[in-house]
C-alpha cells in the first residue's frame, strides 16, 4: 500500500508544562522506536507472552486509551499518535498512575502498520474520532479507505476486531460502506448498521457535551472471520 496523502496536518500547538515534562522525562519508558530495523515482537516489547495487543490509531490526548489500559491490565495497548501534546499528556498520566501495559509510537500510522506490525498479531484496532475532512475536496485525506482497511485485516488475527467511532454522520456512512465491502469482515451489529457504544469504549467529556447538545456519535464494530471463536478476554465483542 502506497499512501502519499497524509490524513493529518502537523501544526505547531501549545504544549503545557506537564506535557513537556512527559515528553522529556518519561516518553523513553513507553516509546517504541519506528527506526528499529525489524518488525516489533510484542511479547518482547511488553515483557509478557500471554497478552493480546490492541492498537489505537490517533489517540488524541489519550483519555480513552488511558482508561481502557487501566481497566484491562490483561491487555497490551499500542497507541499511535503524531501530535506531541497528546503524547506528552498520555505519557504523564501513565507515569503518574504507574500503568505498564501501554506503549507509544510517534509516527505516521500507515507507515507503522506497513513495516512494524506483524500479520495476524493484533487482537484489534480502534480508531476513535478520526479527522472527518468534511469538505468534499478533502475526502481523499480520510484515513479510512478501502486500501487501508485491507491492510488492517492482514494485521489482525482471525476473530480480531476493528472498532471505529465518529461524530460526523457523513464519515460514519463512508466508514460503514468501506468496512461492509471487505469480505473478510463481519458487522457485529446483526442488522448491518451501527453498533451501540460498547461499554469498553469510555465516554469522553467531548461526547458528553455533544450528547447534551443533541449531537450524534456512530460506533462501528466489525470482526474478522466471525466464525472463528475466540475466548481471549481482550476481545469483548
Swiss-Prot record:
Protein residues bound to substrate: 135, 167, 204-207
Keywords on record: Methyltransferase, S-adenosyl-L-methionine, Transferase, tRNA processing
Pathway of action: tRNA modification; N(7)-methylguanine-tRNA biosynthesis
InterPro entries noted in UniProt: SAM-dependent_MTases_sf (IPR029063), tRNA_(Gua-N-7)_MeTrfase_Trmb (IPR003358), tRNA_methyltr_TrmB_bact (IPR055361)
Active site per the UniProt annotation: 131
Protein name per the record: tRNA (guanine-N(7)-)-methyltransferase
EC numbers: 2.1.1.33
Amino acid at each position: 500500500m502506497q499512501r502519499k496523502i497524509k490524513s493529518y496536518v502537523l501544526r505547531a500547538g501549545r504544549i503545557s508544562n506537564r506535557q513537556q515534562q512527559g515528553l522529556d522525562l518519561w516518553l523513553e519508558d513507553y516509546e517504541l522506536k519506528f527506526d528499529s530495523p525489524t518488525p516489533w515482537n510484542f511479547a518482547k516489547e511488553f515483557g509478557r507472552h500471554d497478552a493480546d495487543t490492541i492498537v489505537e490509531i490517533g489517540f488524541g490526548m489519550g483519555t480513552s486509551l488511558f482508561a481502557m489500559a487501566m481497566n484491562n491490565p490483561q491487555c497490551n495497548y499500542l497507541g499511535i499518535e503524531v501530535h506531541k501534546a497528546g503524547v506528552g499528556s498520555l505519557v504523564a498520566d501513565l507515569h503518574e498512575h504507574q500503568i505498564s501495559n501501554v506503549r507509544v509510537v510517534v509516527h505516521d500510522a500507515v507507515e507503522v502498520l506497513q513495516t512494524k506490525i506483524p500479520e495476524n498479531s493484533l487482537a484489534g484496532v480502534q480508531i476513535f474520532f478520526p479527522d472527518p475532512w468534511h469538505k468534499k475536496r478533502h475526502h481523499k485525506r480520510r484515513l479510512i479507505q478501502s486500501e487501508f482497511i485491507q491492510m488492517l485485516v492482514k494485521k489482525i488475527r482471525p476473530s480480531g476486531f476493528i472498532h471505529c467511532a465518529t461524530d460526523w454522520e457523513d464519515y460514519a456512512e463512508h466508514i460503514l460502506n468501506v468496512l461492509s465491502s471487505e469480505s473478510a469482515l463481519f458487522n457485529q451489529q446483526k442488522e448491518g448498521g451501527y453498533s451501540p457504544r460498547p461499554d469498553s469504549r469510555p465516554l469522553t467529556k467531548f461526547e458528553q457535551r455533544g450528547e447534551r447538545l443533541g449531537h450524534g456519535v456512530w460506533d462501528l464494530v466489525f470482526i474478522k472471520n466471525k466464525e472463528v471463536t475466540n475466548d481471549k478476554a481482550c476481545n469483548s465483542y
